[in-house]
Amino acid sequence: KIVNLAPNYSDVTKFADLWVPVRPGTDAAFLLSCIHVILQEFHVNRRSTYFYDYVKQFTNLPFVVQLDEQDDGSYLSGRFMRATDFSQYAEEENADWKLIQLEQGTDKVRLPIGTLGFRWEEEKTGRWNLEGKDTQGEEFDPMLSCMGDDGEFEEVQVNFADFTDTFDTKLGQTEGKGNRAKKVLRGVPVKRVTNADGKEVLVTTAFDVLLAQLGVNRGLSGAYPTDYDDASQPYTPAWQEQETGVDRELVTRVAREWADNAEKTEGKSIF
């Protein structure tokens, strides 16, 4: 099936199964809404085994992100935590380029092979691939979310920048001067780890940051959208409708069909 995402009816559209006539310059809003739907329905409401296993092994989503506390008690998403941040891994070769994961079920800090630092080791060990193993060759299950399956977790408020209203998308009315990004406070599940300096640090995973940034509702506190029809928060189908002119039901349909095909064919959906 071919879906043509374009403002104008063209020769490509004639041969497509579906035409999505977005306003010029708003395709990002449409696609971000698709991602919102896919995360909500294939990762949260129902955990797709194929997607779950794939993102844990082949993406940066299970890697640990440090949260930086602000003066008002809220937090900002910081950098990825590295081997240099932990005493047990600080002497690793290229330690600044080796990233950290947490082990599911134990919360233990683990150093997986396969990140950039392993590619450039002096001794060519061939440990270049993410295989779910640590530096000792032991297999472990990386934690994808700090929320956990048992429903027990700690939550803090994290500041996210909403850039969706920095420019007006109405044609011919943008003056070239952007608005300031809005500050959005959202709850994020966290874990506590002790770094090489003996300091306790709040961390989360890139997956948890992504879900919060895109407003995927998991029952956490803060400015999350209530449902797909909530146009007050960015990335929902209703929000993209007012930006792109595409009906909210259509964006939901496209997202579901794209992800459903990817799940059933193990990755044979392409944009």
Could you describe each region identified by the protein language model?
Residues 1, 263-271:
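Short, intrinsically disordered, charge-balanced linker/junction segments flanking boundaries
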Residues 1-8:
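Short, acidic/small-residue loops that bind anionic groups at enzyme active sites
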Residues 10-14, 18-264:
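Long, well-ordered, tryptophan-enriched scaffold segments
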